[in-house]
């Protein structure tokens, strides 16, 4: 692994490791000088690490809103709807997070049922103890209509559209904030799913917009038996049943979306119809994931990688000194703020009346100045 968020421990907990170990013996290391069948990497702020692996098949994997560069990587797994033959697989982050949910509900007290593959591990007995409200609402022991209005959990404040929608919705009806952004509780919730299950809606906006960019946020809402209010991927209805959530992209503006949310909130039958819709779209009356995404499809993708000896990446493309630090998003933001601070006096000067008069006089004198320069050159 060139770089993986959380290192070896997190990779071993990932769905990719879980799937691959069903067929392959996996030996992990991060030494570019040792032989490897493939190397995982992510260019976000760490592109130089992958460049050390010159003669190894590179696999791009991301949980962020970024597209793969096929000059730098041989294969890629991402959010975008790309058709690049057998070199690309679309596997949004929500699908990866289904694995964590499955591991969580391998429990004798869980209201959710698991496929046999996940029941091989000895089950726990703590789910209901840790999720009493979630279990009660899923099992029909409490009325889903008699819950709070809406919940919101976010840790990244740099999401202006998400923040603006929260403020607009919160001005109509109080929205409980359990994260570090727009917190209303006085503390950050530790059990997100249990918290979400106590409300009728969950505001699950992505931090940025991108076609196909669907993360775990909408999955958390479904898992918590609450209706997602979603914004992020304009094509999200390909991934999830549009009758099962509020898609803010369907409305002209925030006001229209909020009016619809208020309608659901005040009309019991409409709310319950949406709540009990299958989250997945159906093809031939069978619910399934978009583009038939499955463990088998993912295994076939890696089977092709491992059996194909071709290395596609261009060693000369995007090459840079491995010791040269890359520019990060924070660096760019600081540079922008520094340049803006230097430009501010000039901007203020440009609004000054005297400055405008001198500038206008200078512009009128330009033809004469050019003529003088030509005469001097002669």
Where in the sequence are the language-model features?
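Pol beta-like nucleotidyltransferase catalytic core
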Residues: 1-24, 30-35, 39-41, 45-54, ...
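Histidine-centered beta-alpha loop that forms part of the nucleotide-sugar donor binding/catalytic region
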Residues: 61-65, 179-180, 206, 226
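His/Asp/Glu-enriched short active-site or ligand-binding loop at hydrolase and phosphoryl-transfer sites
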Residues: 174-182, 204, 232
């Amino acid at each position: 692994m060139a770089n993986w968020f959380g290192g070896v421990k997190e990779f071993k907990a990932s769905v990719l490791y879980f799937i691959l170990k069903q067929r392959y013996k996996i030996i992990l290391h991060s030494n570019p000088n040792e032989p490897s069948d493939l190397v995982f990497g992510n260019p976000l702020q760490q592109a130089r690490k992958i460049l050390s692996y010159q003669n190894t098949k590179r696999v791009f994997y991301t949980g962020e809103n970024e597209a793969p560069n096929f000059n730098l990587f041989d294969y890629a797994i991402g959010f975008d709807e790309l058709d690049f033959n057998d070199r690309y697989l679309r596997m949004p982050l929500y699908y990866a997070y289904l694995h964590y949910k499955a591991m969580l509900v391998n429990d004798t007290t869980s209201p959710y049922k698991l496929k046999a593959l996940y029941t091989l591990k000895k089950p726990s007995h703590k789910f209901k103890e840790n999720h009493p409200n979630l279990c009660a609402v899923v099992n029909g022991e409490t009325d889903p209509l008699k819950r709070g209005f809406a919940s919101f959990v976010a840790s990244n404040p740099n999401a202006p559209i998400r923040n603006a929608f929260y403020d607009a919705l919160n001005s109509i009806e109080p929205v409980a904030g359990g994260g570090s952004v727009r917190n209303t509780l006085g503390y950050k919730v530790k059990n997100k799913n249990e918290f979400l299950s106590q409300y009728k809606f969950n505001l699950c906006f992505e931090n940025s917009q991108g076609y196909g960019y669907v993360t775990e946020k909408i999955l958390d809402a479904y898992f918590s038996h609450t209706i997602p209010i979603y914004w992020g991927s304009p094509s999200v209805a390909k991934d999830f049943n549009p009758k099962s959530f509020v898609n803010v992209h369907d409305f002209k503006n925030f006001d229209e979306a909020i009016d619809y949310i208020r309608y659901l909130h005040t009309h019991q039958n409409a709310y319950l119809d949406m709540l009990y819709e299958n989250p997945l779209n159906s093809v031939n009356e069978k619910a399934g994931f978009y583009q038939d995404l499955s463990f088998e499809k993912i295994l076939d993708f890696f089977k092709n990688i491992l059996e194909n000896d071709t290395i596609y990446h261009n060693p000369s493309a995007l090459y840079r000194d491995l010791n040269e630090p890359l520019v990060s998003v924070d660096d760019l933001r600081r540079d922008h703020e520094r340049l803006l601070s230097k430009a501010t006096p000039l901007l203020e000067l440009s609004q000054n009346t005297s400055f405008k008069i001198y500038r206008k006089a200078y512009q009128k004198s330009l033809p004469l100045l050019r003529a003088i320069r030509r005469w001097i050159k002669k």
